[in-house]
């Protein structure tokens, strides 16, 4: 019987079968060969190459088992790290995704008999956090990458520095309040009883009709009054001058206190303006891929950030092809639009505010923007670095 042609249904079916997963009982782990049926597997077991592999394995079976176990563990953990990160996930979900690859290492060739035994072993070795629930075993990858540990240390250091700055500001405010209380004497009002020398005397009120009449009456009275009355008037005038001088000094003290408060507010605003973080990814911004590890297809191509994971990783969608990729922020850079386009501030005191690009300065690699959202709407900000802003999708 002749061999079937390339486009016959049988040939097409054979090629489809060869690409997909076959039954596990017809797979030879030593030779890493998958047979399609029982007859093919029987022929393979009788072949010379298979017999040679069995002889090699019989000389040192533990070495082969350790090799397969190590490969299985490394591939499983790599899939868990790349696909799920540090999220808590059911172990069966990870295993099903792992065995979907045609060239995977089968568990029956390793030192673990079941997936539960392998999960418990991961927990004992400290590679993952494992816990048992009524729905089964859940695992969580423990990231011990030096870069991740360095980021965590930097975040802890920054939090500690922020707490120190807050304590310094609180002490400064307390010192200002203490100085203000020491320089100001507290005035306690005193209440006295109304005393009348003659109970039969009537109480009268003199209401002047206007400034002219009062000034005229004063001038006429001053002409007829004696020197003692003039002394009394002079003393009352001096008392008024003293009161006015005291009120002016109090107003000056208030101005000084207000200036100190303004100084504190300026310090806080400057601190917020200069506050920076080592992460900048935000959803719905346009970024450019700068890594060459993905090939020329994605190098220097633009994409839209769809999701941010753990502050440093983003799921991006390519603008031209629509492909979705999961990349670290070190493999991305911001995109500066043309003047007049909308942007998003990614770092500094204006983080999270949308704005409009007004102009760019190519010599200093900075830009001038106008804030469009938030309480600072309408403010014009100069000297914003290129890496602190990006074009909105």
UniProtKB/Swiss-Prot annotation:
Region (Winged helix-turn-helix (wHTH)): 51-160
Residue numbers spanned by region C-terminal subdomain B: 340-391
GO biological process entries: DNA damage response; DNA recombination; DNA repair; DNA replication; mRNA processing
Classification via InterPro entries: C2H2-Znf_KIN17, DNA/RNA-bd_Kin17_WH-like_dom, KIN17-like, KIN17_WH-like_sf, KN17_SH3, KOW_KIN17, Rib_uL2_dom2, Znf_C2H2_sf
Residue ranges the record marks as coiled coil: 147-180, 250-277
Entry comment describing in which tissues the protein is expressed: Ubiquitously expressed in all tissues examined, with highest levels in skeletal muscle, heart and testis. Differentially expressed in non-tumorigenic and tumorigenic cell lines. Highly expressed in proliferating epithelial keratinocyte cells in vitro (at protein level).
Region entry C-terminal subdomain A, spans: 284-334
Pfam families for this protein: C2H2-zf_KIN17, KN17_SH3, SH3_KIN17_C, WH_KIN17
Composition bias type Low complexity, residue spans: 209-224
Subunit structure of this chain's protein: Associated with DNA polymerase alpha, RFC1 and cyclin A, in multiprotein DNA replication complexes. Also associates with replication origins at the G1/S phase boundary and throughout the S phase in vivo. (Microbial infection) Interacts with SV40 large T antigen.
Job description of the protein: Involved in DNA replication and the cellular response to DNA damage. May participate in DNA replication factories and create a bridge between DNA replication and repair mediated by high molecular weight complexes. May play a role in illegitimate recombination and regulation of gene expression. May participate in mRNA processing. Binds, in vitro, to double-stranded DNA. Also shown to bind preferentially to curved DNA in vitro and in vivo. Binds via its C-terminal domain to RNA in vitro.
Protein name: DNA/RNA-binding protein KIN17
Organism from which the protein derives: Homo sapiens (Human)
Record gene name: KIN
């Amino acid at each position: 019987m002749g061999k079937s042609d390339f486009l016959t249904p049988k040939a097409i079916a054979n090629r489809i079968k060869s690409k997909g997963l076959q039954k596990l009982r017809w797979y030879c782990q030593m030779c890493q060969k998958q047979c399609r049926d029982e007859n093919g597997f029987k022929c393979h077991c009788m072949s010379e190459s298979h017999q040679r592999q069995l002889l090699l394995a019989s000389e040192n079976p533990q070495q082969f088992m350790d090799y397969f176990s190590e490969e299985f563990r490394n591939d499983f953990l790599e899939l868990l790290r790349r696909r799920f990160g540090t999220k808590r996930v059911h172990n069966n979900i990870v295993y099903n995704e792992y065995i979907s690859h045609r060239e995977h290492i089968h568990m029956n060739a390793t030192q673990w008999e079941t997936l539960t035994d392998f999960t418990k072993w991961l927990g004992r070795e400290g590679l993952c956090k494992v816990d048992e629930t009524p729905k089964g075993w859940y695992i969580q990858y423990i990231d011990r990458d030096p870069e991740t540990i360095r980021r965590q240390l930097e975040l802890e250091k920054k939090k500690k520095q922020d707490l120190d700055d807050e304590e310094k500001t609180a002490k400064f405010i307390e010192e200002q309040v203490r100085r203000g209380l020491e320089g100001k004497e507290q005035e306690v009002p005193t209440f006295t009883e109304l005393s009348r020398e003659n109970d039969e005397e009537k109480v009268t009120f003199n209401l002047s009709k206007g400034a002219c009449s009062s000034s005229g009456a004063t001038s006429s009275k001053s002409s007829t009054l004696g020197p003692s009355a003039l002394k009394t008037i002079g003393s009352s005038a001096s008392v008024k001058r003293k009161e006015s001088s005291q009120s002016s000094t109090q107003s000056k003290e208030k101005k000084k206190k207000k200036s100190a408060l303004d100084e504190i507010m300026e310090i806080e605003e400057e601190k917020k303006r200069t506050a920076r973080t080592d992460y900048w990814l935000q959803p719905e911004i346009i970024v450019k891929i700068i890594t060459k590890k993905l090939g020329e297809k994605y190098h220097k191509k633009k994409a839209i950030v769809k999701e941010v994971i753990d502050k440093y990783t983003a799921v991006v969608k390519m603008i031209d092809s629509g492909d979705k990729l999961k990349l670290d922020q070190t493999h991305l850079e911001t995109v500066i639009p043309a003047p007049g386009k909308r942007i998003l501030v990614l770092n500094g005191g204006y983080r999270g505010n949308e704005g409009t690009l007004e102009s760019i300065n190519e010599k200093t690699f900075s830009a001038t923007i106008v804030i469009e959202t938030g309480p600072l709407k309408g403010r014009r900000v100069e000297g914003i670095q290129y890496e602190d802003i990006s074009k909105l999708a």
